[in-house]
Amino acid sequence: IHPHAGGYIEFADEIDKIMEDIPAEVAGLCLDTGHLRYSQMDPVEWLRKYADRLDYIHFKDINEKVYNEVLSEHIRFFEGCGKGSMCPIGTGMLDYPAIYKLLTEEINYNGYITIEQERDPRNVATSLRDVKKSVDYLKSLGFE
């Protein structure tokens, strides 16, 4: 189960309800740091809360200035991505050193993590450049 900003399972109460209703042996959870923060949740708190249900993690970061503009203008999620609400990891508002510490020292997560760069799909060069920046930043924290 992958909660997603702009989707049917997005907010804290919806995530809690579906985790309550669906047994762990039936479905795990793919938490997305960017979608959690976009929907007003602290990724560290939620990764900790559902550590025992984590099957997979998606990493992304949010440009705070663009994010605030998108929210104030009531722009839909994917249109906001096209405007640059998502940015290279390490350049936005998420606390990746805290996420790294949680995953490696506290919950000992050893599963897969996908770096996502949600951008205007017509601008492939920018997306690839941003993914490289994200990889370089995450490696500097200690991610392999």
Predicted regions and their residues:
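Short glycine-centered, acidic/aromatic-flanked micro-motifs in structured strand/loop junctions
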Residues: I1-A5, T33, Q117
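Catalytic P-loop NTPase motifs of RecA-like helicase/translocase cores
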Residues: G7, L36-R37
